[in-house]
């Protein structure tokens, strides 16, 4: 028997019961049987509309599968509304794995040739482009690389009478001869086409941006690393979607509103969300901190990466040990060539140790204060605080003062220079970067012993009843809080010891300090000690009866028995420490999974609540019914994208500019 639609099954049931009811009634059957059939008919009608009614067993298929009836077809994520009306599958799209390519501009996306061959852009034939379209068709459907440049082919020609003609190598000449004005040529993807690029989950508007195409060999989409944060992408196997825009208006709209450079600054916090990351930061920091000297050859090599054309940095000369003249360029001068004219900034660098005063940071031996005067870097190292996303003051200033185009050009240049210098200089990190001298290890062991001794003293006071409870806390809570404080201090002290012995000549420390990757806490856990493991903000207390593991005595409240890890990752954890560490890690994983589903549902509710709000012509925020929600957008009328970290005006910059103009005027 042919498999029928579930609704057909239900309708068959309804008709069958109706017939039986009529036959029984006409035959004068007993009241009981008629009522039974009457109820059965009600059951079939109910399940025809909704097969998940509470208190009613669902109607099932012969195989035992519950039937999918009218209500189930409309409801929920897989239902008609959300699955087929709000969201549809589309043509002219591609999906594949993503890879990094630091040589592309942030505006570009590398598209595999296979994708470019399949995806097409409609070109309407006019008298002006008639010859161009003829040439396209004559090439046939196979794209070519001529003199290193990609040349697209044509897949279809749509005649004015709406007939589609597939272009092949055999019929290309014939189709070209019969080409008329008004036809549409479906051209394959070409360099410079505007496409939309998206990564799911699409959580904010920067998860879908417009890029220009660069057709490349290979089978993955390529894009530049600064674009990772808005998409929240990494290259461990993520896939992304590409949509080819078909209309001319849509293309213009995407280019003006959605292009990557138009979204460098985020409406979430009024700062750049696209910025230099990882290698770019460590490269530029090493290029500018303490102003190193680069040989003229090396400087030329680095600048050639960005196709530099402009005022070359100042060239200096010095005699080397053999008395030969050596020509060199200062790193800061090289960096200054990337800056647009007229920049004056002064701020702390990210590498500055916490607690260091500005006066100390400005000392040449420290060099942790960035000073840019008239677009010349005078002091400090360029790090996370200058060019990274979210925190990058210099990048933010360029985007604000000179516009998105200038910010994009600066970002493209600064990332290439950072990579170029790092490649030239060499930069390696290994497990040996976490090695501490014996003196440091002894100091850390002494601190661990002191902590354990202090915890034992607290336990003795608790058992004797000498421990004073904190206001509003029980004795047990007070003990736990005091022990947590002691173990926390132990980890901090070990971190300080590790930091004292690991200097900026250590690659891992340099990465952490300049903000390229990792933190000093990560390093202190690798080299010093891991510290107290916590579950739900408390020491680990669950496990066996009166103890956490069978390796401890009953009622043991000491540091090790409750999850204090005194070892470092480098030295390795013993089995009990490893177990406690896994408990802490497991909590993190569960927390992440729970948070994701909660926030997803919350965002959905928020979107549904706010989807009909817009700023009306009179500047008020209204819904479709015309109800006023706000008299001025955001109560202050400030566009968060153009704000300065949420503030409407950057007063410090204005004061500094006025002071400078006063000095120049001699007043």
Model-identified regions with their sequence ranges:
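Core mixed alpha/beta domains of very large multi-subunit molecular machines
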Residues: 1-264, 331, 335, 368, ...
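Structural motif
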Residues: 2-5, 89, 273-277, 401-411, ...
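Hydrophobic/aromatic-rich, well-ordered segments within soluble, folded domains that form packed cores
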Residues: 7-13, 237, 410-420, 600-615
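Function-dense linear segments that define catalytic or interfacial modules
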Residues: 13, 323-424, 539-586
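Intrinsically disordered, low-complexity regulatory segments
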Residues: 80-81, 121, 133, 140, ...
């Amino acid at each position: 028997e042919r498999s029928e639609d579930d609704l057909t099954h239900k309708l068959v049931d309804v008709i069958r019961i109706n017939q039986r009811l009529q036959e029984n009634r006409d035959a004068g059957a007993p009241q009981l049987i008629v009522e039974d059939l009457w109820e059965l008919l009600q059951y079939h009608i109910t399940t025809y509309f909704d097969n998940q009614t509470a208190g009613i067993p669902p109607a099932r298929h012969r195989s035992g599968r519950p039937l999918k009836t009218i209500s189930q077809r409309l409801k929920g994520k897989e239902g008609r509304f959300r699955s087929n009306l709000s969201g549809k599958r589309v043509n002219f799209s591609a999906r594949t794995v993503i890879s990094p390519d630091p040589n592309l501009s942030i505006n570009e996306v590398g598209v595999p040739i296979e994708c470019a061959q399949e995806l097409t852009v409609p070109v309407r034939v006019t008298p002006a482009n008639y010859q161009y379209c003829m040439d396209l068709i004559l090439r046939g459907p196979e794209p070519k690389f001529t003199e290193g440049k990609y040349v697209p082919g044509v897949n279809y020609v749509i005649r004015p009478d709406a007939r589609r003609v597939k272009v092949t190598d055999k019929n290309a000449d014939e189709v070209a001869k019969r080409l008329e004005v008004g036809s549409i040529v479906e051209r394959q993807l070409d360099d410079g086409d505007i496409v939309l690029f998206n990564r799911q989950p699409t959580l904010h508007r920067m998860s879908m941006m417009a890029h220009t195409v660069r057709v490349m060999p290979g089978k993955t989409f390529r894009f530049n690393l600064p674009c990772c944060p808005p998409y929240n992408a990494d290259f461990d196997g993520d896939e992304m979607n590409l949509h080819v825009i078909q209309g001319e208006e849509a293309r213009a709209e995407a280019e003006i509103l959605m292009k990557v450079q138009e979204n460098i600054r985020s409406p979430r916090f009024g700062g750049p969300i696209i910025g230099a990351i990882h290698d770019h930061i460590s490269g530029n920091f090493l290029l500018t901190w303490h102003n190193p000297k680069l040989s003229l050859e090396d400087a030329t090599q680095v600048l050639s990466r960005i196709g530099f054309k402009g005022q070359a940095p100042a060239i200096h000369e010095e005699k080397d040990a053999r008395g030969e003249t050596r020509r060199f360029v200062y790193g800061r001068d090289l960096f200054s060539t990337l800056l647009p004219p007229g920049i004056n900034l002064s701020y702390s660098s990210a590498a500055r140790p916490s607690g260091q005063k500005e006066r100390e940071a400005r000392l040449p031996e420290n060099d942790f204060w960035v000073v840019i005067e008239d677009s010349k870097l005078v002091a400090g190292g360029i790090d996370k605080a200058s060019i990274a996303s979210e925190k990058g003051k210099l990048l933010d200033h360029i985007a604000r003062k000179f516009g998105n185009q200038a910010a994009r050009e600066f970002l493209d240049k600064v990332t290439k220079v950072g990579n170029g210098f790092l490649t030239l200089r060499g930069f390696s990190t290994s497990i040996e970067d976490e090695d501490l001298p014996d003196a440091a290890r002894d100091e850390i062991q002494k601190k661990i012993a002191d902590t354990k001794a202090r915890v034992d003293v607290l336990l003795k006071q608790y058992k004797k009843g000498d421990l004073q409870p904190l206001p509003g806390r029980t004795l047990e809570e007070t003990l736990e809080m005091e022990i947590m404080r002691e173990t926390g201090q132990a980890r901090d002290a070990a971190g300080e010891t590790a930091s004292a012995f690991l200097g900026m000549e250590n690659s891992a420390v340099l990465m952490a300090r300049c903000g390229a990757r990792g933190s000093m806490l990560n390093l202190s856990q690798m080299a010093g000690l891991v510290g107290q493991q916590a579950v739900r903000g408390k020491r680990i207390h669950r496990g066996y009866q009166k103890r956490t593991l069978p390796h401890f005595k009953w009622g043991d409240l000491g540091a090790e028995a409750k999850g204090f890890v005194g070892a470092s990752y480098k030295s390795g954890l013993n089995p009990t420490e490893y177990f406690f560490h896994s408990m802490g890690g497991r909590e993190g994983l569960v927390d992440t999974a729970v948070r994701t589903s909660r926030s997803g549902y919350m965002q959905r509710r928020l979107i549904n609540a706010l989807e009909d709000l817009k700023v009306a012509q009179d500047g008020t925020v209204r819904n479709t019914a015309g109800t006023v929600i706000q008299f001025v957008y955001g109560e202050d009328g400030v566009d968060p994208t153009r704000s300065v970290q949420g503030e409407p005006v950057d007063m410090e910059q204005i004061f500094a500019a006025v002071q400078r103009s006063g000095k120049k005027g001699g007043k």
